């Protein structure tokens, strides 16, 4: 099994990696400084790949993406964003895995996810299909270019997703909710509020889609709902406050553009997201997919069930789940297996010499790993992971230089282990007298 840690060539385990594209390619490199100008304000159709240099799938896509860019040159724009480097852009568009491809067509504020094949031909076909749709939209009177968002509440595509709150509805909707709320307190006559309105509306639709409704954007007319305005000390307009279950509201002091609002909302979503899954290694697909789709993959090898029983194993799993929650912002993968269940994995990582339980982390792209040498406890594992995230810790090459073979097995059923039952031997036909004579 392999764990994925951004690795280091010399002393450091984590290494800054160059992007996958260069200025000589037909793929246009996009960054936070040029994205709005190149893509959002453009009349062109854009295909944009969000990638991470360490991602194996991204590396395999690179030549096909370049091929498509060359074929579509001067017809459709093909770009790429190093989302590992430019977190804000990835977060703005809800990028959770790599590579993610989005098509920016007639409505640049609502890009579509590309779900097609990863070959140059499939990408070109999808681009031409999207281009045909863009032309149809223009024939039908829909704009294919940049929208400054000055239409106010006439922007029906996003108006519906801003939740209007009142003195009567606020507590039930916001304070009793498990969701995160961003609430704008406004005055209808306020010029700044009018400027914010279309940005807030567009952000509401995007945030609703990307967080599955877990972060909500709302608005309160503070000139009408004066109980709320007084309760939260509203003195100027617009004032935006963030409400989270069990916490005091805090002021939002970020930018007032759609992208700024969306970025903050996605940060809040990440903070409140459930911890990553802790998966048992029962086949090669789980092992490889978890490692290749995450920047870092953490694997624990727990003692045999006969050594710990269900209670002992569950106590180890609880520690791992707690740490997975603590490090969830890192977007790491978490795996576990039983001692002896994946022998090639243990051999490749040098696990077993220190006894069980054990833990390791691997940079799958460079096939290097770091081994937990401290105690397998919450404190010991936390120190190990913290050192890795700071780029410290010793590493070694994975044995064999390749992803270890993973054996398919049944998942743990959650119960105590049972010793194998020995078959009773039938001695009824044995002639004891004859045996005695033979021995003599």
Curated annotation (Swiss-Prot):
TM segment ranges: none
Record InterPro entries: PDI_thioredoxin-like_dom, Thioredoxin-like_sf, Thioredoxin_CS, Thioredoxin_domain
Tissues and organs where the protein is expressed, per its UniProt entry: Expressed in platelets (at protein level).
Disulfide topology: 55-58, 190-193
UniProt-reported outcome of changing residue 58 to A: Accelerates dephosphorylation of ERN1
Residues annotated as site: Lowers pKa of C-terminal Cys of second active site: 256
Any one Gene Ontology BP term: response to endoplasmic reticulum stress
Family: Belongs to the protein disulfide isomerase family.
The name this protein goes by in its record: Protein disulfide-isomerase A6
Source organism: Homo sapiens
Designated gene of the protein: PDIA6
